[in-house]
């Protein structure tokens, strides 16, 4: 159901006995900024807030910043609020500029472009083709539909160009998964629902899958997988592999095995600490301690099955 007029400060999820506030995505920021810029260009009036509908069915009332406009273009920004999610893009400004296009553009068509701080795709396996801006399919649709609706409301029979950019996006991107995914020069404009759910396990496992998919579509039949730093340090320091040789799966070993099957990989090699991997011997495919432990019990059981003495066990 749609929650009309609700503010993100009023939306929470409870995880691990904590009350965590939801946020909204860079895609939602891009849509809101584009809508506001279109309103200012078409109406020649400053806009302070816009109401947008997210794919999740939640309406947001977002503040518009850095506004300026002329008769030919309008520029503004929306500040990303990630809620209580530990997101390095929290607080960034996502800018949009809407300009009237020249005669070579079909009337009423929205041309979406990317500028500074928005990454470019350099490898196969992602939603966009090599060389294209890293603006995913859902945000592209959100931005285009929002601007097309304002064109229609204003009765304007001209095409427009929409430019999205993020100051400091290139620097921020170094702290994200983008370098490992083959996205260079900036962050991605993301979000299938338009909403950020704090501490989302699905968001993490989806990112792991995308990283494996990129490797598979760029010719990799086998993949190294590590839960964390123990495994990656061993591959780098002891075996001499590059630091990004392996996919980090955190505690989601079962999911990464499923991903490998889904992608028709020939095999994966798990590299990590015995304290993690001994759990796999008991079929524990999520290795987080809150899911299950039993490490000593697993050792004892397998020692018994191997014929170990009572004293040993």
Q: How does the language model describe each region?
A:
Residues 8-181:
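Generic N-terminal targeting/processing segments that precede catalytic cores or assembly contacts
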Residues 1-7:
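N-terminal amphipathic/basic-hydrophobic helices that include classical n-h-c signal peptides
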Residues 9-14, 21, 27, 181-187, ...:
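A structural signal for small-residue-enriched, beta-sheet-centric alpha/beta enzyme cores
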């Amino acid at each position: 159901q749609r929650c009309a007029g609700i503010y993100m400060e009023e939306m929470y999820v409870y995880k691990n006995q904590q009350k965590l506030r939801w946020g909204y995505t860079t895609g939602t920021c891009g849509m809101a900024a584009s809508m506001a810029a279109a309103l200012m260009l078409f109406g020649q009036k400053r806009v302070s807030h816009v109401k947008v509908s997210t794919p999740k069915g939640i309406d947001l009332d977002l503040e518009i910043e850095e506004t300026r406009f002329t008769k030919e273009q309008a520029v503004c920004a929306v500040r990303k609020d990630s809620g209580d999610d530990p997101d390095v893009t929290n607080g960034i400004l996502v800018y949009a500029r809407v300009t009237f296009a020249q005669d070579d553009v079909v009337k009423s068509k929205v041309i979406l472009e990317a500028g500074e701080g928005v990454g470019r795709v350099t490898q196969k396996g992602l939603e966009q083709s090599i060389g294209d801006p890293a603006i995913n399919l859902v945000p592209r649709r959100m931005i285009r539909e929002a601007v097309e609706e304002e064109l229609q409301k204003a009765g304007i029979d001209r095409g427009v160009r929409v430019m999205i950019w993020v100051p400091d996006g290139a620097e921020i991107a170094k702290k994200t998964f983008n370098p490992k995914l083959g996205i260079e020069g900036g962050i991605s404009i993301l979000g299938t629902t338009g909403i950020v759910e704090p501490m989302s396990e699905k968001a993490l496992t989806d990112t792991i899958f995308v990283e494996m998919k990129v490797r598979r579509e760029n010719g990799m039949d086998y993949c190294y997988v590590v839960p964390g730093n123990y495994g990656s340090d061993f591959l780098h320091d002891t075996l001499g592999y590059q630091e990004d040789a392996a996919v980090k799966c955190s505690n989601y070993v079962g999911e990464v095995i499923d991903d490998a099957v889904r992608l028709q990989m020939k095999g994966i090699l798990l590299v990590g600490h015995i304290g993690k991997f001994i759990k796999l011997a008991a079929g524990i495919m999520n290795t987080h301690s809150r899911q299950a432990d039993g490490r000593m019990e697993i050792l004892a059981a397998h020692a018994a099955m191997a014929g170990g003495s009572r004293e040993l066990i």
